[in-house]
Amino acid sequence: MSSSILSISQGDIAVVTDPGTVWRVGYRPDPWTWTPWQYAENGRFNGRWDDPDGNYRTLYTGTTLLGCLLEVLARFRPDLALVNELDGIIEDPDDHVVYPTSAPGIVPRSWLLPRTATTGTLIGTFCAVTNSTTLSTLRPLFLGQALRYGLPDFDAAALRLAKPRALTQTVSSFLYGTTIRGEAAFDGVQFQSSSSPATGTNSP
């Protein structure tokens, strides 16, 4: 893996070339398969770095298996305020039998069985989107949008937030459309997730 600076018309962008070994959690039998378009909602996927216009998909990977698991299992993370409220409810024993529910934070076996984890070697040129050099170039372009979403600034902290996804998706679309001498400038983005460094690789 090597780091360098790439100049585009708007300014300098920090890039990482050939990041090396990455982890992915995906569906059996081939976890590297792109998610089919028929699973896109209204023609668009809703990942943080997916295209808001539905022109491409993003394949997410992480530098560690733990980081991947924390990301894909985030939706099972219990809401502590909701858990406290539920603890205060006295459940009818008959309801528990007729309408059984999983305890908060429990991952059902049905989620686990079709999935597997694997490693691969990632090659290509990836925009280091939270690098200070990149941010200084992108900030004038996206500060207004960040402020409209109620964020105090367009900075690394804003790009690490899970929401509003429209902000990171718009940045992703801009980077996807950036070309140098008629060729795509980036193969994807390298970003800091809430748990570890991660990458998103783009494909139509």
Where does each model-flagged region fall?
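Active-site and NAD+-binding cores of ADP-ribose-processing enzymes
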Residues: M1-G47, A81-P204
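Extended catalytic/binding region for NAD+/ADP-ribose chemistry, centered on the ART fold
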Residues: G47-L80
